[in-house]
Amino acid sequence: MDKLLDRFFNYVSFDTQAKANVKSVPSTQGQRKLAQALQQELLTLGFSHVTLSDHGCVMATLPANVSWPVPTIGFIAHLDTSPDFSGKNVNPQIVENYRGGDIALGIGDEVLSPVMFPVLHQLLGHTLITTDGKTLLGADDKAGIAEIITAMVRLKHRNVPHGDIRIAFTPDEEVGKGAQFFNVAEFDAQWAYTVDGGGIGELEFENFNAASVAIKIVGNNVHPGSAKGVMVNALSLATRYHQELPVDETPECTEGYDGFYHLQSIKGTVERAEMHYIVRDFNRDSFEARKKNMVDIAKRVGKGLHRDCYIEIVIDDSYYNMREQIIKHPHIIELAQQAMLDCDITPIMKPIRGGTDGAQLSFKGLPCPNIFTGGYNYHGKHEFITLEGMEKAVAVIMRISELTAKRAKES
């Protein structure tokens, strides 16, 4: 395994849970500690141009071992884990030769069940790495880090022909800031792949267009006994606002290429209320229409209010569908598809119902689709990964690197 599993277990021992709404990047010190550890590991392994930025981004180069010119490619994974669930004191469990049925997670009542997660039926005989039911696992995306480094080490030791390969490990992907301070010019690759996907074979170059929406509602509070014609209940206005949105266009009612409105939080009193939404859609025109709809609803619900009472809406775009950029470079996808086929893997092309660092990087001039890690059920206690999936990811990374050099020689 060339330390693949050892690396992974080492990386998940770092608590790198990201924090939302923090101005600094990285948002947590644990990410910086892992970045420093990776910097040292890469230096020890003999990588060149190993750097660690002020914002916790690690970069390094595996130098070419061929004499002909080869395009510089890159592989990228992220340091942080989801803010939605604890990543502290992760205690991975190894289940060898999975035979089906429920898997106990630690000593409590938590189980990983094929009833809830039918994908387990496809993984009989595999080696599973699970949580102990108290934390997430961190395969998203420390598996990606372990797979990239292991692939680079194997390329070097086995003398597989390859050009210059750049690797990078970024902070705060889970809170949408992973690419904010990524220096594309310094990375200096013609294209790259994030290793941040799910099950074996996943290859993704489409993601949501995404925006966050903050709504502030100011009402007027008086004694309810004498409130007629005077009270303006901010909570009632918030309720009216939400009810104007389509009930079947929410995350729990959508899949595939469907977009949605998602109310993430609501709080308030009669005097004042706040609502926070995210808006997602694959189609740019539909995305713009969703945002316009939210503004129009605010105008309708707020119409006729006393001038001291109002509804304020602020919309911030987060990222866009990288398909717009990737389709200009079809060879990047074709190369990954061929690499998977050469590794006896059927490529599974599917849209990302979320975002990756690659989405933002693609709009910064670094086309960057996403490939699988072998993991499942991210962001919670049921997260798990298969050792076979991890090995397959390593093989695909190596084959992409080899094919790039081979095609450059033939062209």
From Swiss-Prot:
Binds 2 Zn(2+) ions per subunit. Zn(2+) 2 binds at D140, E174, H379. One of its GO terms (biological process) is proteolysis. The keyword Cytoplasm applies. InterPro entries: ArgE/DapE_CS, Bact_exopeptidase_dim_dom, Peptidase_M20, Peptidase_M20_dimer, Peptidase_M20B. PROSITE patterns: ARGE_DAPE_CPG2_1, ARGE_DAPE_CPG2_2. Its main location: cytoplasm. GO terms for cellular component: cytosol. It is found in: Cytoplasm. Its EC number is 3.4.11.4. Keywords: Aminopeptidase, Cytoplasm, Hydrolase, Metal-binding, Metalloprotease, Protease, Zinc. Its cofactor is Zn(2+). It catalyses: Release of the N-terminal residue from a tripeptide. Zn(2+) 1 binds at H78, D140, D196. It comes from the Bacteria. The active site is at D80, E173 (proton acceptor). The keyword Metal-binding applies. GO terms for molecular function: metallopeptidase activity; tripeptide aminopeptidase activity; zinc ion binding. Cleaves the N-terminal amino acid of tripeptides. Belongs to the peptidase M20B family. NCBIfam families: peptidase-T, PRK05469.1, PRK13381.1. This is Peptidase T.
